[in-house]
Amino acid sequence: MSFVAYIFFNRGIASEIDGMVYIPEGEFKMGSKGKLEHGDDGGDGRIGLEVGVDEIPLHIVMVKGFYIDRYEVTNAQYKKFFDATGREPPVDSVAPDAPYNWRNGNYPAGEDNHPVVNVTWYDAEAYCKWADKRLPTEAEWEKSCRGGDGRRWSFGNSFITSFVNTHELELKWSQAVGSFPEDRSSYGVYDMSGNVMEWTASWYNPYPTSTLKRETFGEQNRVIRGGAWLTSYLTARCTSRNFAVPEKKHRTMGFRCAKDAN
């Protein structure tokens, strides 16, 4: 495995390995403090930013140092896994004839560097294991997005439509990974606020000290993070939570992998 960039002092930890970015060990503030967070949200007249009740409360989480993919896993990368393992191709079970599905073992022409979508949680987990990696936990994903300064979106605290591939931009499909250089966290991780949503390793559960009760909590749904080309600026926030059964496939859902630092 090649080591790129520099070594973190005497700890023997590279800032980047094979397309993965190092996220340092430490505490960070996870979640949201209340149902309405006030402040600058883009200068469009809104005086507050609505948050999901499952994001509450704001709490401190300790995360060990780890690596995370700089970009979402692409069609071209997934194709190597598909060819090597004979995995079921990424096809939307609800719309099997849609033009965005893989055909005859191939992804749509010209979409080599688009994020792979229509993969189940099990597909994503299997790919990461095949690549000697793993899926990131929900906490790891949020820390990677918020950076060291607790941003609302990967790029800052004000939403700017042109910075990210969400519904507001009306591109109506994913774009090649890294196409939006501003959609980049302070750690250097791209497309966390837009393009496609991403599976995580975590079960969908309430946060510590939360009294929220939902039938969807528990070991039945996996957490999905990030915004997508079909979702709004609210879903694009680093703290926004979504979920699905592990068997779910959707044209807005992809993933990226993580790896332990040691």
What are these regions (language model features)?
Residues 1-91, 121-122, 149, 158, ...:
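Short, compositionally biased
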Residues 22-23, 29, 34-50, 88-90, ...:
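Functional-site microenvironments in short loops/helix caps that host divalent-cation chemistry
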